[in-house]
């Protein structure tokens, strides 16, 4: 059975659409095929995507190098958390799923406090 939530492959167009129209939380992973830690993170995110209630997307920085430099992605892997199209958190380096979940929880808490 195909899990509903799998990691989405994003292009620049998808990312811009997300910034303009995005609702809710999305974790965007910037990675490259030649990057070892990215490959490890890919597995973690694939695993995570099946059991979290937010979307996860991946952007290949070799295919979207212009976007990556505009967003000042300096090292790989890098992740961003967007809420309603706004970048609210940037993460760098490989992380295990529990670390990622902890950060998402923290970000959600922080965001819900700022909106009241």
Regions picked out by a protein language model, each given a short descriptive name:
Residues 1-3:
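Short, Lys/Arg-enriched N-terminal segments with co-localized hydrophobic residues
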Residues 81-115:
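Non-catalytic, surface beta->alpha helical segment in thiol-disulfide oxidoreductase systems
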Residues 13-17, 64-67, 98:
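Short loop/turn elements that flank and shape the SAM/SAH-binding pocket of Class I
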Residues 71-80:
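Structural micro-motif
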Residues 24, 30-34, 75:
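Short pre-active-site segment immediately N-terminal to redox-active cysteine/selenocysteine motifs
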Residues 35-38, 79:
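The canonical Cys-X-X-Cys-His
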Residues 8-10, 30, 42-66, 73:
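Thiol-based oxidoreductase modules, predominantly thioredoxin-like and allied folds used
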Residues 7-26:
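A short beta-strand-turn-helix
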